[in-house]
Regions:
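C-terminal regulatory/oligomerization modules of transcriptional regulators
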Residues: 1-13, 136-164
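N-terminal helix-turn-helix DNA-binding core of bacterial DNA-binding proteins
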Residues: 30-75, 161
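Charged, amphipathic alpha-helical coiled-coil/dimerization segments
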Residues: 7-8, 84-144
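Alpha-helical linker/hinge and terminal dimerization helices associated
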Residues: 28, 32-35, 72, 115-134, ...
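Residue-level recognition of specific faces of alpha-helices
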Residues: 24, 49-55, 71, 82-85, ...
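N-terminal leader segment of winged-helix/HTH proteins
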Residues: 1-43
C-alpha cells in the first residue's frame, strides 16, 4: 500500500501505482549505477563505459553512437562522450560507416571484449546473489511490466517528435 502524499495531484489508483513504479525505477537506476561503478572500478571502468561496451557486445554488429545511445537510453552525445574515452583506451575502434560518412560504426577491440567479459563475470556473481532474493517469476513479471511501459513511452516520444 502506498502512502498518500499531499504534494501530488489527486490521480486514479492506476496513475498512483504507475507513479510509484516510476519513482522506484528512478531509485533503482541510481543504485544500479552506483553499485555498477563500484563493481567495475577495479577494471578501470564506470557504469556508463560498461554500458557502452555492453551495447556493442550484445548487438553483435558494429553500432553508431546514436544506436548505442538508443540501446543505453541516453543521448547520442552521452554515448559519444563515453566512446571517445573508450577509443582513447583502445577498447573500441571506429570504422567507416558506408551508410553515413560522418557517423562511424564502433566495434570492440579484443581488449574491449576481454574487459567486457571480465565485467560480466563480476556482474554474474551479483546477479546470482540477487537471484536468491528475487524469484525468476518475479524478475520476469517486472521485466514484462517495464518493457511494456518502455514501449508505450517510446510510442509517445515518437508522436511528440513528429508533432514538434
Amino acid at each position: 500500500m502506498t502512502k498518500e502524499n499531499p504534494t501530488f495531484a489527486k490521480t486514479s489508483t492506476g496513475a498512483a501505482a504507475v507513479t510509484q513504479l516510476t519513482l522506484t525505477v528512478f531509485r533503482l537506476n541510481g543504485l544500479l549505477l552506483h553499485c555498477g561503478d563500484r563493481l567495475v572500478k577495479p577494471l578501470g571502468l564506470t557504469s556508463a563505459r560498461w554500458q557502452v561496451l555492453g551495447a556493442i557486445a550484445l548487438a553483435g554488429v558494429p553500432l553508431t553512437a546514436p544506436k548505442i545511445g538508443e540501446a543505453m537510453g541516453v543521448t547520442r552525445q552521452g554515448a559519444q562522450k563515453q566512446l571517445n574515452v573508450l577509443a582513447e583506451q583502445g577498447l573500441v575502434e571506429a570504422r567507416p560507416n558506408p551508410a553515413h560518412r560522418r557517423s562511424p560504426q564502433y566495434i570492440l577491440t579484443p581488449q574491449g571484449l576481454a574487459l567486457y567479459r571480465r565485467a560480466e563475470a563480476l556482474w554474474a556473481v551479483q546477479a546470482d546473489d540477487l537471484a536468491k532474493l528475487i524469484t525468476s517469476a518475479q524478475a520476469s513479471a517486472a521485466t514484462q511490466t517495464l518493457e511494456s511501459m518502455l514501449h508505450q513511452l517510446q510510442i509517445v516520444n515518437v508522436y511528440s517528435e513528429i508533432e514538434s
